[in-house]
A protein has these predicted regions:
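Charged, alpha-helix-forming regions
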Residues: 1-139
Length: 139
């Protein structure tokens, strides 16, 4: 999982949004699972496990609690993008699921955010997911 590539539109990088460190790691773990250079629909569900977060530096004893809390907050979070002289506000995710006994959450990205995190061909930033574990803050 740590050797996965994360690709995001520069518009997302420059956008106005607030995510905690754990929320950011959940989003990036899910983005890393999006097939590169392929069309993705908003029907796709991506899973993030306790092990995924532990690999990114979340403490083992609190990983599931942190994951669950982060996903609950992420469900309420939005991102504001400046597109063609319009400020557009959209949600990160449209659905979340919990599988408590397996330590896994599932999320479905919102239809509006998908063009900025999947099949991005121009004006993007990419980095290895393993670099995320070195982040001390949310950005």
């Amino acid at each position: 999982m740590q050797n996965e590539l994360v690709v995001k539109s520069n518009q997302v990088i420059e956008a106005s949004y607030r995510l905690s460190v754990v929320e950011q790691r959940v989003v990036l773990s899910a983005i890393a699972k999006i097939p590169k250079m392929s069309e993705v629909s908003d029907d796709e569900i991506y899973t993030v496990s306790v092990q995924d977060l532990q690999a990114l530096g979340v403490h083992e004893k609190t990983a599931y609690r942190d994951l669950k809390e982060a996903v609950n907050r992420l469900y309420e979070r939005s991102i504001s993008l400046d597109i063609d002289d319009k400020l557009i506000k959209m949600r990160w995710v449209q659905r979340i699921e919990f599988t408590d006994n397996q330590g896994i959450i599932a999320l479905r990205f919102s239809k509006d955010i998908l063009p900025f995190i999947s099949n991005v061909k121009a004006n993007f930033t990419q980095y290895m997911l393993s670099e995320v574990s070195k982040m001390q803050g949310a950005y």
